[in-house]
Amino acid sequence: MGLPTLEFSDSYLDSPDFRERLQCHEIELERTNKFIKELIKDGSLLIGALRNLSMAVQKFSQSLQDFQFECIGDAETDDEISIAQSLKEFARLLIAVEEERRRLIQNANDVLIAPLEKFRKEQIGAAKDGKKKFDKESEKYYSILEKHLNLSAKKKESHLQEADTQIDREHQNFYEASLEYVFKIQEVQEKKKFEFVEPLLSFLQGLFTFYHEGYELAQEFAPYKQQLQFNLQNTRNNFESTRQEVERLMQRMKSANQDYRPPSQWTMEGYLYVQEKRPLGFTWIKHYCTYDKGSKTFTMSVSEMKSSGKMNGLVTSSPEMFKLKSCIRRKTDSIDKRFCFDIEVVERHGIITLQAFSEANRKLWLEAMDGKEPIYTLPAIISKKEEMYLNEAGFNFVRKCIQAVETRGITILGLYRIGGVNSKVQKLMNTTFSPKSPPDIDIDIELWDNKTITSGLKNYLRCLAEPLMTYKLHKDFIIAVKSDDQNYRVEAVHALVHKLPEKNREMLDILIKHLVKVSLHSQQNLMTVSNLGVIFGPTLMRAQEETVAAMMNIKFQNIVVEILIEHYEKIFHTAPDPSIPLPQPQSRSGSRRTRAICLSTGSRKPRGRYTPCLAEPDSDSYSSSPDSTPMGSIESLSSHSSEQNSTTKSASCQPREKSGGIPWIATPSSSNGQKSLGLWTTSPESSSREDATKTDAESDCQSVASVTSPGDVSPPIDLVKKEPYGLSGLKRASASSLRSISAAEGNKSYSGSIQSLTSVGSKETPKASPNPDLPPKMCRRLRLDTASSNGYQRPGSVVAAKAQLFENVGSPKPVSSGRQAKAMYSCKAEHSHELSFPQGAIFSNVYPSVEPGWLKATYEGKTGLVPENYVVFL
């Protein structure tokens, strides 16, 4: 129930009811006053908490800014560089958010605290002053009235008239005070409605402005976030592949002889105890010793472990160097210590007595120093596999396997990822490579299933006496893909492939051509270029020595295979540029990180720090929005190239050829716009470096589930890659273990983790294009003039780089104006500014369009856009 109304006429009567109603208003004003005091106190605490939060976030961002990633190896992949740079990018993003919070905190006192305090003091305070005046006048009036009424009627008339005049004057003063008090109370009650609420509204507006700015930053940050997810997924894939290889190496080291000595620059090295004379006998001091047989140089340095704060607790002294004269095993009965031997050196008189750790270790030292002990063969760490050779039988076997796969199983899910049964694979190998088998033996595809054939093909390549890409060129390939210049990577790999022996290059040509075809069906088999690189990288480029350092280079081996697949036509069907210098060993440099993808260089305009999309809403393409992108990566980016992920409205993209004759693969688009995605996670495993008795059934085989989603919709995903790399439309979703995860419909949140890849799916496996020979038409055209419509693209930002990327997409050769061209495929226009034409149509006045991948041409008197890869110039 509301407050009672105060009438001015009631002030004249000053009835008990009036006083009661007046008291209700006074109680309400007092309650409001206390509430405002508490609100000001709580608001001050809130502002203080915001200030403390801001300081904590700034300190957190500074910690991110100061930390420096270091990776194993002498070079870093593009993914590793992006990840290393990400902490600084996170710090810059947090700083941008805190800048907005700082403005909120600065304005909060003026917007919230000061107006509330002013209202409390000026308005409610004025009402209190009015009450004091009213009470004073009331008390004075009724006191004088009481005295006036007590006057005797016998008083003089003049005295009575004076008393009447005084009482009238006091009553008038009381009446005016009462009216003013009533007016002020009602004024405060009315002003309370806006002067009290307006500061709160202003504060909330500022708070929501801060939140909205955070939302805008999140929107603008989305492209970088998505690319970083791709980088993280690639790195996770490489880790899974490398970890398995390192684990195998570790297990072999465990099972090897305890005194196994790995290859090094020294003939022999290790710890030895050296007998040193003391005034009261002898003492044995541990030294780290090395010996070079060529120069007969023996060095030893004191090495002792201390539980101090020094690194590793190891204290070493400067090494002493000697030239060895002789080495003799110490007789057992001549010393009470075991495993001893004596050496003579030029620099000292007498002998130096050394103690090895074991009898086998002493034999190794004696053998290295040409001692009198018999020479023992160094233990082998790895049992040699039965070797295969690049002979006629091998070429026939590979061709037959590829023919069988391409005939019946190229679209099978997890092709080459899921291994066959071990016994069947061994039977296939024994049958094919038996000494009694003819070189051109056929493979009965009815007898052998697809998994057995693919595992047999990989097993043959693993068991070659020398890997297909040779030990000699192994380091050169690795150095080539470690280059900062992505164009040079391709050119260097191109040149190195042509340095391979003829048979090796021929076999590599056959295999890579097949892998290109496999990757073109990645929509069905999910074997993208990235996945194939993970599988065949270690197989085609295994290192001569299995060391942890070699395992760390597996990620670069994968990149080599990706380059071979993506640039197959150029590498195998064109001669390399003789002016391209071959790779030279490089020392590790930190300069690449300064050129890493970074979004926060340069000054920032409001809401322009990250450009969230590259086209206007009414254009034919849209950038991926956070609403349609779960936390998991949609596709796996190749670590040696920069790619763009975008979505399309068109549902009728047809295949078409891009430069190099490699078709694109476009994902069917959604028909109703529902956000329905099938999510799948990957845990890729390396499928190489297995023992002869072990196949992919043990190392690679994972459970495979269909990729599903709640509806029959399939939001389109398309990747556009920067030239001169071909195979631009290949999807790079990495998968060794595939499992379906339900995705929520509509605006429900997705449950994928950041380590999970997301894949577009429907209730049924996506069907291939009706005519697989047709290359897909460019599903999206970006208007370059709208590329920066949503924000300022700073130099060096990933969005600016991606905008430039779209400017470079297309044929690497410039198209001259006014030429004629012929249509290789038919095409039906999807927009009014496109041309429809049949196969064989002749176009005139053909010249480049401002939209990448499209040409402007005239056909039958009509001028419009045609897909660049649908035509050939006459």
Curated annotation (Swiss-Prot):
Biased composition (Polar residues): 667-686, 700-711, 749-762
Record key words, sorted: Coiled coil, GTPase activation, Phosphoprotein, SH3 domain
Domain Rho-GAP residue range list: 376-572
Tissue occurrence: Highly and selectively expressed in smooth muscle cells.
Coiled-coil segments on the chain, per record: 225-261
Annotated stretches, region: Disordered: 575-720, 749-777
Gene Ontology annotations of biological process type: activation of GTPase activity; negative regulation of Rho protein signal transduction; negative regulation of systemic arterial blood pressure; negative regulation of vascular associated smooth muscle contraction; signal transduction
PROSITE patterns: PH_DOMAIN, RHOGAP, SH3
A Pfam family per the record: SH3_9
Positions carrying Phosphotyrosine: Y376, Y870
PANTHER family xrefs: OLIGOPHRENIN 1 (PTHR12552), RHO GTPASE-ACTIVATING PROTEIN 42 (PTHR12552:SF3)
Function: May influence blood pressure by functioning as a GTPase-activating protein for RHOA in vascular smooth muscle.
Protein name as annotated: Rho GTPase-activating protein 42
Organism whose genome encodes this protein: Homo sapiens (Human)
